[in-house]
């Protein structure tokens, strides 16, 4: 397991608990020194769980399966990776396609959590869903904090775009603040039950022309909009245009969790918080789960350990 080197990354790919799971299954685990520091896990805890703690070069020399959270910030092409090695983690396949192809030509395979399908057979290895849940809750809380004082004098009124894992978590987060039950916007009526179960007070089935969304904004103006609408591997739909933003009014906040996929909001700029001329604040930052490093590492680590076991047993079947 590698120490994370991506900017502001605090998570770790395996917790000591995950190492113990793999060690108990008969696998030998090598952990890069300091890997768990950002999430609060000391090297001694990994040793106590059965791991060998070593430097980066030793990890690559000894490991047949290498796990990370995010791709390393250094060039893998320059490292002495052995043919037959499998790299497990988020791979950013859209942006790293050429590097992944070069590694494959050397006999090094990349297993991407980004592309694990979401169904009943993949629940234990679906790291993307678990991270999305954390991002939804964090995004709601951070957006709420950015509201103007006048918008926080009473229960906050929120609108959540998208009813996937992140959207449902954002809806549920409203209850922890005793806010109004959010309005949920989805593109399928089948999402309605899940939205209400999470705590939504209203469900708006939106169509491609966004007419239903615009009508909702005009009749029930929210203080906070949390954007989560995206399909895995696809560009995010553009749901908030300038007309929609003008309906929100000064002091409202838009949190766009899907900026990396293009964003749901026309004014979103990745890793930036900006106040628009109309007074609406639009914000995004990379890696919302990293602000909750310990629970995020436990969730990610459980998926990573399960994936490593599947690979070791020859039962993994993901891109």
Describe the residue ranges of each PLM region.
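An N-terminal-biased, well-structured beta-alpha scaffold segment characteristic
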Residues: 1-102
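Glycine-rich phosphate/diphosphate-binding loop of Rossmann-like nucleotide-binding domains
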Residues: 2-36, 145-227
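Glycine/serine-rich phosphate-binding loop and adjoining beta1-alpha1 elements at the start
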Residues: 3-5, 74-157, 287
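Generic hydrophobic/aromatic pocket-lining and core-packing "Φ" positions
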Residues: 19, 43, 100, 140, ...
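Short acidic-hydrophobic, aromatic-tinged amphipathic segments that line or gate anion-handling sites
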Residues: 50-57, 111, 202-209
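Rossmann-fold NAD(P) dinucleotide-binding segment
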Residues: 68-94, 215-254
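Rossmann-fold NAD(P)-binding glycine/threonine-rich loop
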Residues: 93-119, 235-288
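Adenosine-phosphate binding glycine-rich loop
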Residues: 114-153, 259-319
């Amino acid at each position: 397991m590698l120490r994370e080197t991506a900017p502001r990354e605090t998570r770790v790919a395996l917790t000591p608990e995950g190492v113990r799971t793999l060690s108990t299954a008969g696998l030998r685990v090598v952990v890069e020194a300091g890997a768990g520091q950002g999430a609060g896990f000391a090297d001694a805890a990994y040793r106590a769980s059965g791991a060998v703690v070593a430097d980066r070069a030793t990890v690559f020399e000894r490991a047949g399966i290498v796990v990370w959270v995010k791709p390393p910030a250094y060039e893998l092409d320059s490292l002495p990776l052995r043919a037959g090695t499998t790299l497990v983690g988020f791979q950013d396949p859209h942006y790293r396609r050429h590097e992944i192809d070069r590694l494959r030509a050397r006999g090094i395979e990349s297993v991407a959590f980004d592309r694990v399908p979401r169904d009943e057979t993949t629940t234990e290895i679906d790291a993307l869903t678990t991270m999305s849940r954390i991002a939804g809750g964090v995004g709601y809380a951070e957006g709420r904090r950015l509201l103007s004082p006048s918008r926080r004098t009473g229960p906050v009124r929120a609108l959540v775009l998208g009813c996937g894992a992140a959207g449902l978590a954002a809806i549920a987060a409203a209850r922890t603040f005793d806010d109004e039950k959010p309005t949920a916007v989805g593109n399928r009526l089948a999402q309605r039950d899940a939205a209400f179960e999470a705590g939504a007070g209203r469900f708006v089935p939106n169509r491609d022309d966004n007419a239903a969304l615009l009508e909702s904004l005009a009749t029930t103006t929210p203080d906070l909009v949390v954007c989560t609408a995206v399909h895995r591997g696809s560009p995010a739909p553009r749901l908030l245009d300038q007309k929609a933003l003008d309906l929100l009014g000064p002091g409202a906040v838009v949190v766009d969790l899907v900026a990396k996929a293009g964003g749901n909001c026309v004014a979103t700029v990745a890793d930036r918080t900006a106040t628009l001329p109309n007074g609406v604040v639009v914000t995004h930052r990379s890696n919302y789960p990293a602000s909750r490093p310990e629970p995020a590492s436990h969730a990610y680590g459980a998926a990573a350990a399960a994936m490593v076991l599947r690979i070791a047993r020859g039962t993994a079947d993901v891109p």
